[in-house]
């Protein structure tokens, strides 16, 4: 099959009906950029409830690195569900959690061994990083970048600077967070080209933040996305 294969107008009638039901009972705070109602997916192909087929070029929301419904992942989920469905790793011990932490520790390129903190989402991971950075360094400040998305909980939202709608109405935010221009040469925030760039984004941190708002010794962490989301 050649994808995409579109059989109806978008969204189709079944999708429209479900979206209307959703609007009546689900929080409007969710970000739904596309009127897509998925019925099933496999690999990189996605089928909606009206039978339209799409090619997923974004791995879901950039989290399905093995594709949709990879057989090995499905088997692992079924196997775990047959053993038990919930076990709080913060309260009890679990062999699979230990094995995963051991495998991660073997991959992390740091000296002295590594320890893992498991979370349910990227937002929770960012919250944990904020706490860890401040706890370990004893420093208050964090540098993030314009255009970055780090979550919508109150701590992570202080770092997020992607869209005004994500922050509107929730301030004041956690203090100690400072934003700088993100070094995106494709869409340079100061209008330069790679051949005439003199690292102005880094200069902003050194010559603006560090000269006017804080010293480097007050920085607990720099939070950056290799590819902004």
Question: Where are these predicted regions, by residue range?
Answer:
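PLP-dependent aspartate aminotransferase-fold enzymes
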Residues: 102-221
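Conserved PLP phosphate-binding loop immediately N-terminal to the Schiff-base lysine helix
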Residues: 225-229
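Conserved active-site and cofactor/substrate-binding residues in soluble primary-metabolism enzymes
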Residues: 13, 17, 41, 68, ...
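Short beta-strand-to-turn element immediately C-terminal to the catalytic PLP-Schiff-base lysine
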Residues: 47-48, 66-68, 158-160
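Active-site and channel-lining beta-strand-loop segments
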Residues: 35-57
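Glycine-rich loop-to-alpha-helix module at the N-terminal edge of alpha/beta enzyme cores
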Residues: 5-8, 12, 53-143
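Active-site-adjacent loop/helix segments that line or gate small-molecule/cofactor pockets in enzymes
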Residues: 1-42, 92, 97, 201
């Amino acid at each position: 099959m050649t994808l995409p294969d579109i059989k109806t107008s978008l969204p189709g009638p079944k999708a429209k009906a479900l979206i209307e039901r959703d609007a009546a009972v689900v929080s409007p705070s969710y970000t739904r950029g596309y009127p897509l109602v998925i019925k099933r997916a496999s690999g990189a192909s996605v089928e909606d409830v009206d039978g339209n087929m799409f090619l997923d070029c974004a791995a879901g929301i950039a989290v399905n690195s093995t594709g949709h419904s990879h057989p090995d992942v499905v088997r692992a989920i079924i196997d775990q569900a047959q053993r038990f469905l919930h076990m709080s790793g913060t309260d009890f011990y679990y062999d699979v959690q230990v094995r995963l932490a051991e495998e991660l520790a073997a991959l992390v390129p740091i000296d002295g061994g590594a320890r893992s903190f498991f979370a349910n989402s990227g937002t929770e991971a960012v919250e944990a990083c904020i706490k860890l950075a401040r706890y370990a360094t004893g420093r208050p400040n964090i540098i993030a970048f314009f255009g970055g998305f780090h979550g919508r909980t109150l701590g992570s939202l202080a770092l997020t600077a992607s869209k005004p709608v994500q922050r509107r109405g929730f301030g004041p935010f956690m203090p100690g967070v400072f934003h700088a221009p993100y070094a995106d040469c494709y869409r340079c925030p100061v209008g330069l080209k790679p051949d005439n760039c003199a690292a102005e984004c880094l200069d902003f941190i050194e010559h603006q933040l560090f000269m006017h708002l804080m010293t480097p010794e007050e920085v607990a962490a720099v939070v950056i996305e290799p590819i902004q989301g």
